[in-house]
Amino acid sequence: MDRSPLFLIIMGAPGSGKGTQSKLLASQLSLLHISSGDLLRGAVSKDTPLSQEIKSYLDQGKLLPDTLVWKLVHEKLDEFQQDTLLRRLSFLSRSENSAILDGFPRTVTQAKLLHEFLSSYFPNYKVILLDISDEEVLNRLTSRYICPACQGIYNEQQGFSSCPKCSVELIRRSDDTLEVILDRIQTYKQETQPVLDYYTEKQKLITIDANAPTQQVFQSILDSLSASLVYQERDCCNCDCDDED
């Protein structure tokens, strides 16, 4: 029986629902949600050699090198992996040793670095692609509102003027304009297709239709992960289910 923990990577175009689905999966499956965006924002607020190196690039308006982004993500993954080993020695369930990574990798170089790490500790990891049309991306992002306090995302159809969770007035992101969105879509396609090709070759990719409503997309992901979840349930019961005829 394969007892390796569940590790998921979630990818998709801007507006595909990566953050929303990551949070739903983290809650439903007891996964640690690792967001590269959160890691970057956290690093910038600190005073460490790594954060200073990151700030030097950002202050100059330069893109962070693959190796530097990997340092940031690897630091968190290494911490998680060490904690996972301790939890597994305590015979905790698989779900308590599992995680979902959002916002990384963005390049083939990053994907290769990540694959090398995961192959050693989480060999059965999967990559979830939220596949969404350009039209749906435009529809979602041009009608999107953000809570500046909790980062909750809402749309015009919901009719909220303030966040229902923390009562803060909702705002529009400055980059949610048609011109910027079209540019982001094009950049995403150029950068991401080689990464998707890489994961397809590695037989890691699970493609989900993300044009559907949130809960329908979520259920599609769960259905696609059913084999992994069956392993999880069997690990938890510690029985000899495989010995049955």
Curated annotation (Swiss-Prot):
SUPFAM superfamilies: P-loop containing nucleoside triphosphate hydrolases, Rubredoxin-like
Keywords: ATP-binding, Cytoplasm, Kinase, Metal-binding, Nucleotide biosynthesis, Nucleotide-binding, Transferase, Zinc
Keyword Metal-binding applies: yes
Pathway annotation from the record: Purine metabolism; AMP biosynthesis via salvage pathway; AMP from ADP: step 1/1
Chain sites annotated for binding Zn(2+): C147, C150, C163, C166
EC number: 2.7.4.3
Catalysed reactions listed for this entry: AMP + ATP = 2 ADP
Region (NMP): 35-64
Primary localization class, coarse: cytoplasm
Chain residue ranges for the region called LID: 143-176
GO molecular function ontology, one term from the record: metal ion binding
Top enzyme category: transferase
UniProt binding sites for AMP: S36, R41, K62, L63, L64, G103, F104, P105, R106, Q110, R173, R184
Any Gene Ontology biological process: AMP salvage
Residues that bind ATP: G15, S16, G17, K18, G19, T20, R144, I153, Y154, A212
InterPro entries in the cross-refs: Adenyl_kin_sub, Adenylat/UMP-CMP_kin, Adenylat_kinase_CS, P-loop_NTPase
Cell compartment(s), UniProt: Cytoplasm
PROSITE patterns, alphabetized: ADENYLATE_KINASE
GO CC field: cytoplasm
Oligomer status and interactors: Monomer.
Description of its domains: Consists of three domains, a large central CORE domain and two small peripheral domains, NMPbind and LID, which undergo movements during catalysis. The LID domain closes over the site of phosphoryl transfer upon ATP binding. Assembling and dissambling the active center during each catalytic cycle provides an effective means to prevent ATP hydrolysis. Some bacteria have evolved a zinc-coordinating structure that stabilizes the LID domain.
Record's function text: Catalyzes the reversible transfer of the terminal phosphate group between ATP and AMP. Plays an important role in cellular energy homeostasis and in adenine nucleotide metabolism.
Family designation: Belongs to the adenylate kinase family.
Protein name: Adenylate kinase
Organism listed in the record: Chlamydia trachomatis serovar L2 (strain ATCC VR-902B / DSM 19102 / 434/Bu)
Lineage: Bacteria, Pseudomonadati, Chlamydiota, Chlamydiia, Chlamydiales
